[in-house]
Regions:
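Short beta-strand-to-turn element immediately C-terminal to the catalytic PLP-Schiff-base lysine
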Residues: 145, 241-242
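Short, low-complexity, intrinsically disordered N-terminal peptides in bacterial proteins
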Residues: 1-6, 178, 243-244
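Feature captures the catalytic cores and cofactor-binding loops of soluble hydro-lyases/lyases
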Residues: 159-241
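Intrinsically disordered, low-complexity regions enriched in acidic/Ser/Thr/Pro/Gln residues
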Residues: 1-147, 152-157
Length: 244
C-alpha cells in the first residue's frame, strides 16, 4: 500500500512560448524534462519534421519553455492554431502522416512476438520509475526500447506528456537534421488513446506496447498507418493490432 503521508505527484501549468511571448502551447504536466517535453510535443503534433527546424529551446526563470522555430515550423504552427488545435478530435479529423513508412525492424518484431521478453522489459520499466517510487503512484510511465534495451524512462501525470518526453529526448540526442525515426519501441503503462497513437505516428515511432489496451479509435489509426500495437503486453496471449 502507498504511504498515506507520501507527497502527491507534482503537477504544474507550463507554458511554451515564442521569443516574443506568443503562446505556442500550455500543458498540465509534471514539471521535469521540460525541454524534452517541448521538443517532443513539436514532433508529435507534426509541427516539426527535423531537429534543425527548432533554432532555440530553453527554460525561463519562471519555469516555462521558450523556443524559436524556423520558417517552415512557424507556418505549420499557424495552420495548426487556425484550423486544428490539439485534442482527440484532431487525431481523427486531420490526415495523420508519418515522416517515414512505419515498419518495425526484425528485432522489434521478434520482441513484440515474445510475451516473456516484453514482460521482463515492463518489470525493468517499473523498477526504474524514480518518481513513482517516491510518490507511491499517480504517475504514468513510459520507456523507449532500442536494440532490446530500455534506453530512456519518462514519467508524468499526463500520458501524452510521457510520449512527448520520450520522443523529445530521442530527437535531442540525434544528429541535427536526422529523420524523425530510429526504429524504437515505446512501452506505456496506460491506455493508448487516439491522441497518443497519432502522436506516435507523427513522430515516426513504428511500435508501441502497453499493459492496458488501445481504444477503438487508436486501433483504427494503427490499421490505417501501420503502427504496431501490443495490448495487455504482460499476458501470455497479448492482443495485437495494426502493423503486426
Amino acid at each position: 500500500m502507498p504511504d498515506p503521508a507520501a507527497p502527491a505527484p507534482p503537477e504544474a501549468i507550463v507554458a511554451f512560448e515564442q521569443p516574443d511571448g506568443t503562446l505556442i502551447a500550455r500543458w498540465l504536466c509534471t514539471p521535469e524534462r521540460l525541454a524534452d517535453l517541448a521538443l517532443g510535443w513539436l514532433f508529435c503534433e507534426g509541427l516539426v519534421e527535423r531537429a534543425d527546424e527548432v533554432h532555440e529551446l530553453h527554460l525561463t526563470p519562471a519555469g516555462h519553455v521558450r523556443g524559436r522555430l524556423g520558417d517552415a515550423a512557424r507556418a505549420r504552427l499557424a495552420a495548426y492554431d487556425r484550423d486544428s488545435g490539439p485534442g482527440p478530435a484532431r487525431a481523427m479529423r486531420d490526415p495523420i502522416r508519418a515522416p517515414v513508412p512505419l515498419r518495425p525492424d526484425e528485432g522489434t518484431q521478434a520482441l513484440l512476438a515474445d510475451p516473456g521478453r516484453l514482460g521482463d522489459l515492463f518489470l525493468e520499466l517499473f523498477d526504474g520509475a524514480r518518481l513513482k517510487s517516491v510518490h507511491g503512484g499517480g504517475l504514468h510511465t513510459g520507456g523507449r526500447v532500442v536494440g532490446g534495451r530500455i534506453v530512456d524512462i519518462a514519467e508524468d501525470v499526463s500520458r501524452s506528456a510521457v510520449v512527448d518526453k520520450l520522443v523529445g529526448a530521442a530527437r535531442r540526442q540525434a544528429r541535427s537534421g536526422e529523420p524523425a525515426s530510429d526504429g524504437a519501441l515505446v512501452l506505456l503503462s496506460g491506455r493508448i488513446s487516439a491522441t497518443i497513437a497519432a502522436k506516435l505516428v507523427r513522430a515516426g515511432v513504428a511500435a508501441a506496447a502497453t499493459i492496458s489496451l488501445p481504444t477503438s479509435l487508436a486501433v483504427d489509426i494503427a490499421e490505417r498507418t501501420g503502427l504496431a500495437i501490443v495490448g495487455r503486453a504482460r499476458r501470455e496471449t497479448p492482443f495485437r493490432y495494426g502493423g503486426l
